[in-house]
Amino acid sequence: MSLSHLYRDGEGRIDDDDDERENFEITDWDLQNEFNPNRQRHWQTKEEATYGVWAERDSDDERPSFGGKRARDYSAPVNFISAGLKKGAAEEAELEDSDDEEKPVKQDDFPKDFGPRKLKTGGNFKPSQKGFAGGTKSFMDFGSWERHTKGIGQKLLQKMGYVPGRGLGKNAQGIINPIEAKQRKGKGAVGAYGSERTTQSMQDFPVVDSEEEAEEEFQKELSQWRKDPSGSKKKPKYSYKTVEELKAKGRISKKLTAPQKELSQVKVIDMTGREQKVYYSYSQISHKHNVPDDGLPLQSQQLPQSGKEAKAPGFALPELEHNLQLLIDLTEQEIIQNDRQLQYERDMVVNLFHELEKMTEVLDHEERVISNLSKVLEMVEECERRMQPDCSNPLTLDECARIFETLQDKYYEEYRMSDRVDLAVAIVYPLMKEYFKEWDPLRDCTYGTEIISKWKSLLENDQLLSHGGQDLSADAFHRLIWEVWMPFVRNIVTQWQPRNCDPMVDFLDSWVHIIPVWILDNILDQLIFPKLQKEVENWNPLTDTVPIHSWIHPWLPLMQARLEPLYSPIRSKLSSALQKWHPSDSSAKLILQPWKDVFTPGSWEAFMVKNIVPKLGMCLGELVINPHQQHMDAFYWVIDWEGMISVSSLVGLLEKHFFPKWLQVLCSWLSNSPNYEEITKWYLGWKSMFSDQVLAHPSVKDKFNEALDIMNRAVSSNVGAYMQPGARENIAYLTHTERRKDFQYEAMQERREAENMAQRGIGVAASSVPMNFKDLIETKAEEHNIVFMPVIGKRHEGKQLYTFGRIVIYIDRGVVFVQGEKTWVPTSLQSLIDMAK
């Protein structure tokens, strides 16, 4: 902001002299800038408050400013103010308001307030300061002062390629002469006296300013100091809307939009005018004309304006303005509607073009389908013609298979969508019945397997297979097996003898991967099992020469858990046959041994404890131990059952019926001056009769250690007058040897257990990757020595069945289901392991 107001006189003019005089009366400038927050304020100092106008001002206390007041120069000559008349502020305001239009003002017509002020140099201004304004001093002697100093700047510049009299830079593009300064004529602002560019500037930067742009900028700056920047009269401004703007606007005038249904019948009372008016919809208000009231004066009809903007009302025609505005709105609406209609038609053309392309594709597809269906129909009609009895070239099963393969390969979509069941029933079934008419399954079990396998790939419905369905009306292959193949099997099973099981087992093994699972289940449950059950009821273990396991066990891979109901009557009949059995009869072991791995461990142990162990205990109790004449038959009869009965049961028999008598005989022998070498051989001979598994049992080990202790006590005592030479040493050596063998055996067992644990740890580390539930069950089965394998050709609701020991299970979403009596029961993994053991 300019500080020229500080130099104004009482009426706002700038005083020409340099006298620091300030008037205290209120001027027009003070009134106009009363509410101007940006005006320069002078804060009164303490000295001014004390002394008033007589206060002296130091140069240090002056306020900083842009142009600033200079300190009074007492050395300058005295300047006098020329007398004259000046106009008042009111007359100047009248002259400003009298201008109707803005006229170009030349720079010479500027008010004196905005012109440059001449410097009051006075007589003492040093003339030497004027010399540098020209700035034309030669540059050749640049840096000549270094001749009288120790500076090396000139030398460094010359080493870097500087040539005196030329510009700096690689290409000497720098300026040679210093930047010239130009003295402004007066004290005005920058640009007040025209261009201030020097000759050097014009040469270095030859840019010519446009006079029109300069004039426009000048007029713009000129209008800023007027009281009314817009002028007393404004030219009317017109706003034009292009069609593109209306399209971008994209809406219809609110006055012309259709009213909403819920607001179309609303009663509205208008009290904005002189009289109260009633409208029956908001749309009527929108169509109300801006007609002035007749009785009101013209001044009251105009909107109130405040301040200086309130002007006299002009010529107004509300009806005409309304009609013109209505025409404008209708035109805009028509333009927008036409644009929308055009866009809609273009979109419709694009949509119809896409529809045409789609319909063309559909038409081509339908033509291909019609062509393919025609070819398929020709092939079917050819098959039907060759199926007639009087045809000279009858259709064979191999040719029919080739026709179906062609349909499946070349016309898969039509073949998949067609009714394969009806087609196969009409063409394939008669040929298949003719093919199997002379077939005997027990003599030629593999007859027709290749043909049926080929037709399985042609007719089986994969979707029903994945869902585990057995709908005969939807699967042609299942219906073929059930209606054509199954009657031959039923017929042969009714004539089959269960004791001759090998031909039937071979037949089913050959077809188990071909026939559907539910048909195999039907054969095993409804045809085979009843025959076996009836034969088991008629079996007598005392009279039948053929062992029962020879015609029951071959069915285990196919039937597995289905044979569980037969085990109970078999055990009952075997128990009845063993009532009068003696351990000397080895035939019982031959009959029972094949059933050890078939029965569950619990049922087998219970059967042994009930029927075999008492007989063995009675036989062992009849054993007579005589070192001089020993009969070992009874002992051998008992020891032969070691693999059949558990180790704990055998050790119990030895503790109860053998070791008491054996230790008693040893004590009696030692008390009669024995030969210790014979006792040693006798001891080692009996110990060799037992297996390592029995000797490792703690009870058996304790009994033999007790015998060694008895022998050591007998040797160490002084009983008897005669002592065999070396007997004590021999017995001590024997004791040491036997104890060392026990320690070695225990160490070997511990080492084996450690190796097993290490291998198990390696397996766990290797299997640390994420596994599924089936892999976890398999790992647990390996740890507990339980057989875990899938059942071939067996599924339940599409899930694969597995055998876990003697239990049939299946896995569904991480849950194990065990086959119960009637339903499948979910169980935990630990319970499954316990049941399998």
From Swiss-Prot:
GO annotation terms (biological process): biomineral tissue development; negative regulation of protein-containing complex assembly; spliceosomal complex disassembly
Segments of this protein annotated with the region Required for interaction with DHX15: 1-50
Pfam families given in the database record: G-patch, GCFC, TIP_N
SMART domains: G_patch
GO cellular component, one term: cytoplasm
Main subcellular localisation: cytoplasm
Region annotation (Disordered) ranges: 1-21, 53-72, 85-133, 179-236
Keywords attached to this entry: Biomineralization, Cytoplasm, mRNA processing, mRNA splicing, Nucleus, Phosphoprotein, Spliceosome
Localisation: Cytoplasm; Nucleus
Record field: compositional bias (Basic and acidic residues): 1-13, 53-64, 103-116, 217-231
InterPro entries (UniProt xref): G_patch_dom, GCFC_dom, STIP/TFIP11_N, TFP11, TFP11/STIP/Ntr1
Motif (Nuclear localization signal): 700-705
An example molecular function term from Gene Ontology annotations: nucleic acid binding
PTM-bearing positions, type Phosphoserine: S2, S59, S98, S144, S210
Feature: compositional bias, Acidic residues: 91-102
Residue ranges constituting the G-patch domain according to the UniProt record: 149-195
Region of interest called Required for nuclear speckle localization, as start-end residue ranges on this chain: 710-734
Binding partners and assembly: Identified in the spliceosome C complex. Found in the Intron Large (IL) complex, a post-mRNA release spliceosomal complex containing the excised intron, U2, U5 and U6 snRNPs, and splicing factors. Interacts with TUFT1. Interacts with DHX15; indicative for a recruitment of DHX15 to the IL complex. Interacts with GCFC2.
Function field: Involved in pre-mRNA splicing, specifically in spliceosome disassembly during late-stage splicing events. Intron turnover seems to proceed through reactions in two lariat-intron associated complexes termed Intron Large (IL) and Intron Small (IS). In cooperation with DHX15 seems to mediate the transition of the U2, U5 and U6 snRNP-containing IL complex to the snRNP-free IS complex leading to efficient debranching and turnover of excised introns. May play a role in the differentiation of ameloblasts and odontoblasts or in the forming of the enamel extracellular matrix.
Family according to the record: Belongs to the TFP11/STIP family.
Identification of the protein by name: Tuftelin-interacting protein 11
Species, as recorded: Pan troglodytes (Chimpanzee)
